[in-house]
């Protein structure tokens, strides 16, 4: 094992804590820090209060092509491209800053984030491996995640050409939540009328 400076180790611990707080998986921590697996496990358990989940990382580019994940991953990639381009931030710092900004943007719209930090990290790795590319929508001009080497001259994004069932699961839960308080209000008003 190489000798590390105390400052480098402290920086790795800080990054590991931040990644765990954002929901990173152990595989990401192991790749992005120089800390031992045992130390990462201790950090994970201390921050989360539980052992890290087991299992494989996402490995398919197809997940990023479905409607909602494509919109979220495209937002993240545009933020990431800004940080690595004009802002001059690179590596893990660019991923973390982009992910923080992605979460801030999603939370203002009261939407659940579809993209986890580990998926965002995997997305960047897919771009680095030339498995994915950005494609400009011919209708709105926005840039969206697309398979690499797919023809993009007539590309139309998922927002301009929304699938017929897009958002139906969200509408069902919103409708159920809206119906429940109305029913309780009606029951309460009946009790008030009877009394």
Swiss-Prot record:
Explain how, and how many, cofactor molecules are bound: Binds 1 zinc ion per subunit.
Q: Which cofactor does it need?
A: Zn(2+)
* Disulphide bond pairs: none
Taxonomic superkingdom: Bacteria
InterPro entries attached to this UniProt entry: FlhC
Instruction: From the UniProt record, give one GO term of the biological process aspect.
Output: bacterial-type flagellum organization
Q: Which Pfam families match?
A: FlhC
Any idea where this protein resides? Cytoplasm
Arranged from A to Z, the UniProt key words for this protein are:
Activator, Bacterial flagellum biogenesis, Cytoplasm, DNA-binding, Metal-binding, Transcription, Transcription regulation, Zinc
* Gene Ontology terms, MF aspect: DNA binding; zinc ion binding
Q: Name one GO cellular component term.
A: cytoplasm
Q: Its principal location?
A: cytoplasm
* Record-listed Zn(2+) binding positions: 137, 140, 157, 160
Please list where the region (Disordered) is annotated: 165-195
- Which protein family is it in? Belongs to the FlhC family.
Give the function comment from the record: Functions in complex with FlhD as a master transcriptional regulator that regulates transcription of several flagellar and non-flagellar operons by binding to their promoter region. Activates expression of class 2 flagellar genes, including fliA, which is a flagellum-specific sigma factor that turns on the class 3 genes. Also regulates genes whose products function in a variety of physiological pathways.
Quaternary structure (record) = Heterohexamer composed of two FlhC and four FlhD subunits. Each FlhC binds a FlhD dimer, forming a heterotrimer, and a hexamer assembles by dimerization of two heterotrimers.
User: What protein does this entry describe?
Assistant: Flagellar transcriptional regulator FlhC
* Source organism of the structure: Thauera aminoaromatica
